[in-house]
Amino acid sequence: MKTPRAWQRMLSGRRLDLLNPSPLDVEIEDIAHGLCFVARWNGQTDGEFPYSVAEHSLLVERIFTLVNPKSTAQWRLVALLHDAPEYVIGDMISPVKNAIGPHYSKLEDRLIEAIHIRFGLPALIPVKIKAQI
């Protein structure tokens, strides 16, 4: 049986394999561009403009830094990139994630690990840090 196509061509020209992502195929410009166009909560927010995942990511990093003023640049970057996989898989709401089951979480985990490695961050984040984000 032939393996289905599971990659996406990014604006940078990189080809990101969604099932086996390589840190070498992750570019910050692709992440920033993608997250700017992804609306939180499927666009179900009040206001004239959608609330983007990019804006949310900046807010989370800012709050994390305010709560943890002595945090390192490394942990602030982890906070900023906490939803980075959504640049290619979108901002799926939790009820849908739960309905899909563990396959979605595995996909998301592989993407965040590749993203972290690409930017010199630990692939796995300590529970204490993750809970603060």
Which stretches of residues belong to each language-model region?
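Metal-dependent phosphohydrolase cores
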Residues: 1-133
